[in-house]
Design a protein with these regions (language model features):
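N-terminal accessory segments that position/regulate proteins before the catalytic core
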Residues: 1-174, 181, 224-251
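Small-aliphatic-rich amphipathic alpha-helix that forms the alpha element of a beta-alpha
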Residues: 90, 121, 171, 175-184, ...
Length: 251
């Protein structure tokens, strides 16, 4: 192994960079406007209203210790589809907004460094009742699902983009989290990137626990073809790019 490269990548896991950042020179402290907390979309884009918290009828109240104890990666799924209420619950559990939007930030169901929430949530939908197959994006501010575009042979393209791992092709849907790094860089400069990765872990763990309440399973996916995945969801790979995935299906 290349020891110099190992040291370089291990350095990323440390917080030593924070002592080298001149925070007086970050864009926030230079008075540059805060970046949007949600990626923009066209006004005429198709949006699906999700079921609001408090209106769920069939989401089980499961003991937290039970959910934690049963949590595991599940790669084999039944053909039974998920429904809109269940998808609404999973999206709320992983990126839902709690309370009011204050001062350009949102309090959500997951923690984020400095409340910056640099992640966007895409869904590759294959088997959800009443929702056409295709690529969607969660809009946490309005609690809606934005229809991005249809995609032919989506199941096989998802499998190809994760180096042949089969379970995204058999799942009801796959969560694809992207990072928009500038949301975090605006405040933290060069110390932003490690905490974006940490934030992704918070989100995915909530998905694991939430799946236990709806009779579903999930499997986190950290191995994927970066360029192929970015092309599939049509992000530029520079200002926004995929950082984490998780397939979800009925078990």
């Amino acid at each position: 192994m290349d020891r110099d490269s190992l040291r370089q990548y291990r350095y990323f896991l440390k917080d030593s960079i924070r002592k080298k950042v001149d925070f007086s020179q970050t864009d926030q402290n230079r008075g540059i406007d805060v970046p949007p907390i949600e990626k923009p979309y066209r006004n005429d884009a198709l949006r699906i209203d999700l079921v609001k918290p408090g209106d769920w009828k069939n989401i089980a109240k499961i003991d937290l210790a039970t959910a934690i104890g049963n949590r595991q990666s599940r790669r084999v799924y039944r053909k039974t589809p998920l429904n809109l209420e269940e998808v609404s619950f999973l999206l709320w559990a992983t990126q839902g907004v709690r309370g009011k939007i204050v001062g350009g930030h949102t309090y959500r169901t997951v923690p984020s460094a400095g409340c910056r929430h640099a992640l966007e949530t895409y869904l590759a939908v294959l088997n959800v009742e009443g929702i056409a197959s295709g690529i969607y994006r969660y809009l946490p501010l309005s609690n809606q699902l934005l229809y991005e575009f249809p995609e032919e042979q989506l199941a096989s393209k998802m499998v190809d983009a994760v180096f042949g791992q089969p379970y995204p092709g058999n799942a009801a849907l796959t969560f694809i989290w992207t990072a928009i790094p500038y949301r975090m860089e605006w405040r933290y400069g060069l110390s932003a990137h490690r905490v974006i990765a940490i934030d992704a872990g918070h989100v995915c763990q909530n998905l694991y626990l939430a799946c236990e309440a709806i009779g579903a399973g999930t499997c986190a996916i950290g191995a994927y073809d970066q360029e192929a995945m970015d092309r599939l969801i049509r992000v530029d790979g520079e200002e926004e790019f995929a950082v984490y995935l998780a397939s979800v299906g009925r078990v």
